[in-house]
Amino acid sequence: MRVPFSWLKAYVPELESPEVLEERLAGLGFETDRIERVFPIPRGVVFARVLEAHPIPGTRLKRLVLDAGRTVEVVSGAENARKGIGVALALPGTELPGLGQKVGERVIQGVRSFGMALSPRELGVGEYGGGLLEFPEDALPPGTPLSEAWPEEVVLDLEVTPNRPDALGLLGLARDLHALGYALVEPEAALKAEALPLPFALKVEDPEGAPHFTLGYAFGLRVAPSPLWMQRALFAAGMRPINNVVDVTNYVMLERAQPMHAFDLRFVGEGIAVRRAREGERLKTLDGVERTLHPEDLVIAGWRGEESFPLGLAGVMGGAESEVREDTEAIALEVACFDPVSIRKTARRHGLRTEASHRFERGVDPLGQVPAQRRALSLLQALAGARVAEALLEAGSPKPPEAIPFRPEYANRLLGTSYPEAEQIAILKRLGCRVEGEGPTYRVTPPSHRLDLRLEEDLVEEVARIQGYETIPLALPAFFPAPDNRGVEAPYRKEQRLREVLSGLGFQEVYTYSFMDPEDARRFRLDPPRLLLLNPLAPEKAALRTHLFPGLVRVLKENLDLDRPERALLFEVGRVFREREETHLAGLLFGEGVGLPWAKERLSGYFLLKGYLEALFARLGLAFRVEAQAFPFLHPGVSGRVLVEGEEVGFLGALHPEIAQELELPPVHLFELRLPLPDKPLAFQDPSRHPAAFRDLAVVVPAPTPYGEVEALVREAAGPYLESLALFDLYQGPPLPEGHKSLAFHLRFRHPKRTLRDEEVEEAVSRVAEALRARGFGLRGLDTP
């Protein structure tokens, strides 16, 4: 979650600096992934009003006449370039962060363009480049440097734990900071409502899917660009401003972790219903995609008489037909509490992950809908000139939180502390809890937005969190003679040896959760997990994992989404939970030439990862081979089972292309092995003092032929003096026949007690050649280096 410092500071004015905020949030349990400075807007970018917009005949361009403190003309190809809006104008000579070059004065289609009217991407404030950045035409005096009203911002990229959905809103973070002692300024909802009848009705046909649903009414709207301060806040938080009505709904969502949606009343009909989708129903969502709805999808629908039609996917994304437009004058404002499981399934089913669905999947304040309505409607009054009806349509009776017994003495006993009773009670009150009673047992009712506070131990944890975990006294454990753990420690020593060897080969160790998303069983084509959690931290952590590799794939995807590394080489040793609990080792390779920056040739992922495993088992003194075998989650032509000392222990291959496509990943190669590995008695063998003989062999085989089949054939035919066999080249293309590939091997022969004669080596190579030809394979050549 992106947290703009200035926005949070509006609620917590005493915040000292972004660096102090990072430290405070870390103490509260929120890790900052990175701190980013955004909006370095050059002085040469000024505010300008569009006075005129004229199409240039024969082109898609427009000639804009601007007031930028003086009248100038620019040429723009943006579709939204029109009279009556404010724009960001880069004057000639300005170097733009989004372009990396200076803006000039040029003649385009016979028009001298004095600078450039900018999109968010060109200005460097957002990713959108399909149109001009729009402002209200009276936002600033023309010619004012935009940086004066849009100063640089500091944004903290925060990791919010699944048990704290309230912290997905800036107000939730502000409340936690208030518990530390900072003053809290709650945003006001200065609403001037009118006693008016509502022109629509509400029907909730699925109360389990929508336990609390509210509709507000605003009319007389003037849809326009949002003011600069709101656009700046939304861009900093990672969202694109649309117009003042839509922006208000997004702003309040980011403030309160409560998604909402505005429907243009012209397209609602007689009212709004909440129901399950009907078989075959279709809906064009705001992203422009026509979707076939599933009968389990929860939808917001309108109706006229007996006709009912979907308006949006509840809690996920609205429909394109009822979206707010420039000529929208009246809206129905939906603010609801939806069932998290239903929203998660709908979002996954349609491949949609939105800011709204993310929050609904975690859970929203069941009593927060009416305050969010008031806040949004008050902003619509202020920014869009709306008139607002006093009445709300409301369905459902949300259950208030229950009181929890709390004993300060028990908290100290559990934590090993001596926090004063009054101090503990004060902390709970600052967190928004209602505290009743005189002690020794108090009745504490948590605020409705704290869905994670259910037990007395939860309250104890809150006391420790706000006091600071560093205030808990350290105590050395009592000393007891160490038992004889040699038999128990042996597996751990072997695991540590694996870690050491893999780290030495260039792998990075990662640790992932022991939980998995049950939906990942479908996505990765695995058997359903056997062990489901009764009280999961989040829906995506509702089962105990059965494999390690999905966690590694998730780690890779998160890193690719963040900064797109060129290569990755990861491993994990951890527990999995099947019929019985097992320890596994899994590895992942992404990118070519991983760990070989000096190599002239880039090895393919499969053979590179196989080479790493060969090196691993050579260090461990264990025999290793791969035999072709299909696995549902691996590429049909790049998958095999791993055998160690002749015993099957796992798999190696490429992630199935269909899975990679669903996850929007490039090719990824994986292995996963069951531990402990088979044992082999260690025996010292004196290294041979006699020289080795080398031969290269290139075998032409049909493209579908598994590598393991060719390798096994060569090893069997070569005889006892073949010391090693290594693939060094894989080639397809001319002059090979179509549908064939060439596998080139290094063969190393050595006798343990004497020097091999050339004729012995040639005899072994001849046996290999005959065996290959007998199988129908061809040879490209025999070479002696």
UniProtKB/Swiss-Prot annotation:
Mg(2+) binds at residues 452, 458, 461-462. Its EC number is 6.1.1.20. It catalyses: tRNA(Phe) + L-phenylalanine + ATP = L-phenylalanyl-tRNA(Phe) + AMP + diphosphate + H(+). It is found in: Cytoplasm. Residues 39-147 form the tRNA-binding domain. One of its GO terms (molecular function) is ATP binding. Its cofactor is Mg(2+). Residues 688-780 form the FDX-ACB domain. Coiled coil: none annotated. Keywords: Aminoacyl-tRNA synthetase, ATP-binding, Cytoplasm, Ligase, Magnesium, Metal-binding, Nucleotide-binding, Protein biosynthesis, RNA-binding, tRNA-binding. InterPro entries: aa-tRNA-synth_II/BPL/LPL (IPR045864), B3/B4_tRNA-bd (IPR005146), DNA-bd_dom_put_sf (IPR009061), Fdx_antiC-bd (IPR005121), Fdx_antiC-bd_sf (IPR036690), NA-bd_OB-fold (IPR012340), Phe-tRNA-ligase_IIc_bsu (IPR045060), Phe-tRNA-ligase_IIc_bsu_bact (IPR004532). Binds 2 magnesium ions per tetramer. It is an enzyme of class 6 (ligase). Residues 399-474 form the B5 domain. One of its GO terms (cellular component) is phenylalanine-tRNA ligase complex. Belongs to the phenylalanyl-tRNA synthetase beta subunit family. Type 1 subfamily. Tetramer of two alpha and two beta subunits. NCBIfam families: pheT_bact. This is Phenylalanine--tRNA ligase beta subunit. It comes from Thermus thermophilus (strain ATCC 27634 / DSM 579 / HB8). The gene is pheT.
